[in-house]
């Protein structure tokens, strides 16, 4: 079995009727495929949108609401109804499901990140299928992941999945928008996610969901940099999930980095919030970015911000102004200033095990398009 542990992300458009309401037949089809894969020995996680779609009608809304409070209320009602649909269908095959609602803070806070990882590990080891969504009812912008594409990639990286599958209404990444460009061709295999790939992703998306192809590509960066390959394929076929697991479905395959980031490095790269800035000289910049060395105090030119021992800072090349990466400091800001002022600074500010270099691929995640 090539892909034992698989994370599936199912978007709103793959779960709803034309009027935006939840399609029970589509949910049933998804659970049947999950059951077949589970019985074949796969460990599965489902990241599912659709809470708002499942709940807005029950609150008397004629169509999907647009106001934040209305959407949060609809999600509060719909999350239970959606889970009931999944749970009922899976129990018919004697499969236990579990609900987990996450926010960005569950990834940013290292203790909560560890707790979420442990809970998911136990569920998978006990043969349950975790069903995950963002906690839309209470989340605020500062703690919001933003879309389930990103959430699914974060989860796939966290549990070190063997494959992440995006099920959508577009059967992969095209060179243009296939809905309007007859010359657009699907890319079957993507080795590296670069600016050209990002530009190609600026087209297709549907009105019911919140994420188009661009969010999927940026999410794929998180997964592939963490060692998890990604497959984008259509949800329109009745056996699309099974075919994706067997690599017989038409779609776009994103190759994972051969040496994916470990859990600690994932946290540093994607979630750790910087509390300050450090500027270094040319020698220190080369030692960090080219030779995998620790950051010595002797290479520091300037420091800015209020940070304490153990906090995360961003390091810049003083000469070029380029961001080199992030790391955990061994000294607070005031102690560091005193040592730099004495001009006798010796020792290590950031050890290499507490450091992550920002690659061009990772940098794209923090670029506005």
Swiss-Prot record:
GO terms for cellular component: cytosol
Enzyme Commission identifier(s): 2.7.2.11
GO biological-process terms attached to the record: L-proline biosynthetic process
Chain ranges of the PUA domain: 275-355
Ligand binding (substrate): 49, 136, 148
Pfam families cross-referenced by the UniProt entry: AA_kinase (PF00696), PUA (PF01472)
Keywords from the UniProt entry: Amino-acid biosynthesis, ATP-binding, Cytoplasm, Kinase, Nucleotide-binding, Proline biosynthesis, Transferase
Binding, ATP: 9, 168-169, 210-216
Keyword ATP-binding: yes
Location(s) in or outside the cell: Cytoplasm
Catalytic activity: L-glutamate + ATP = L-glutamyl 5-phosphate + ADP
GO MF term (any one): RNA binding
Metabolic or biological pathway: Amino-acid biosynthesis; L-proline biosynthesis; L-glutamate 5-semialdehyde from L-glutamate: step 1/2
Main EC class the enzyme belongs to: transferase
Function: Catalyzes the transfer of a phosphate group to glutamate to form L-glutamate 5-phosphate.
Family: Belongs to the glutamate 5-kinase family.
PANTHER family per record: GLUTAMATE 5-KINASE, ISOPENTENYL PHOSPHATE KINASE
Designated name of the protein: Glutamate 5-kinase
Source species: Streptococcus pneumoniae (strain JJA)
Gene name linked to the record: proB
